Amino acid sequence: MDTILALKVIIMGIVEGLTEFLPISSTGHLILAGSLLEFTGPKVKVFEIAIQTGAMLAVVWEYRVKIAAVLGGLFTERRAQKFAVNIVVAFLPAALLGLVFAGAIKEKLFAPVPVAIAFIVGGFVILWVERRNKQQVHAERVQSVDEMTLLDAFKVGCAQAFALIPGTSRSGASIIGGMMFGLSRKAATEFSFFLAIPTLMGATVYSVYKDRALLSMADIPLFGLGGLAAFFSAFLCVRWLLRYISTHDFTFFAYYRIGFGLFVLLSAHYGWVVWAE
């Protein structure tokens, strides 16, 4: 691996880690970053999905005590069983739809312009949900992930399925969806973190297996370096986001999405930036 390639891999890993758990779309930012860096192609699309494992492991480490308690109580504690079932139920909608539409989505929508449109639409959805929740005094029905019902989990899972569209944001769809359905900001954010574990792992395993013919043993250092960069940047981001949501809403991210999406569309139209496909 030459120095330039290593730098590109590290940058992509950092972008993944910083954006995976914010409601701004990691996939969208990876597509745009890869386009700017001229780091594109079929193998890179697998790389972009695989390095999500690094970000996922950051959540595992941050919530290792909770995860260990759930795993330890799977066969003995009703609370742990309920939580595990909720995660599985929330995971299924995106997993099933992903199996059906992943190929078409990767072929048609993994490009800067569709991503920019999804950025803008998602930004307006966040603004609408934040305004709606402020107007409804009793909007927050669920204060903790342990209070969620099976129906709550299924609704969040259906919301997460919209994130199959690049630029939508997996965390944004699940968090904002959770808030729409009565979860507090903290409960929605934490459930989104936990839901990321099977979702990102499943996406990685599926993508690597499906496109295994494109890969070789020589790619392991590249994937490992990107995953490591994603782990450390995601760990810092998760810690920061948990502090941020205690005193802020997601309005800033909505305006960021809209502004950045408009910039990408205008730059593509007027040729300010050459976005590689």
UniProtKB/Swiss-Prot annotation:
Q: Does the keyword Nucleotidyltransferase apply?
A: no
Q: What else is known?
A: Bacitracin is thought to be involved in the inhibition of peptidoglycan synthesis by sequestering undecaprenyl diphosphate, thereby reducing the pool of lipid carrier available.
The EC number on file is 3.6.1.27
User: Does the record's keyword annotation contain Methyltransferase?
Assistant: no
Catalytic activity reads: di-trans,octa-cis-undecaprenyl diphosphate + H2O = di-trans,octa-cis-undecaprenyl phosphate + phosphate + H(+)
Q: Which GO terms describe its molecular function?
A: undecaprenyl-diphosphatase activity
The record, for NCBIfam families, names:
PRK00281.1-2, PRK00281.1-4, undec_PP_bacA
- Give the primary localization class: membrane
Its biological purpose: Catalyzes the dephosphorylation of undecaprenyl diphosphate (UPP). Confers resistance to bacitracin.
Q: What stretches pass through the bilayer?
A: 85-105, 109-129, 188-208, 218-238, 256-276
- Entry protein name: Undecaprenyl-diphosphatase
The record's similarity note reads: Belongs to the UppP family.
What are the leading ranks of the lineage? Bacteria, Pseudomonadati, Pseudomonadota, Betaproteobacteria, Burkholderiales
Which InterPro entries does this chain map to?
UppP
Q: How does it sit in the membrane?
A: Multi-pass membrane protein
Pfam families noted in UniProt: BacA
- UniProt keyword terms in alphabetical order: Antibiotic resistance, Cell inner membrane, Cell membrane, Cell shape, Cell wall biogenesis/degradation, Hydrolase, Membrane, Peptidoglycan synthesis, Transmembrane, Transmembrane helix
**What are its GO biological-process terms?**
cell wall organization; peptidoglycan biosynthetic process; regulation of cell shape; response to antibiotic
Q: Which GO terms describe its cellular component?
A: plasma membrane
**Compartments where found:** Cell inner membrane
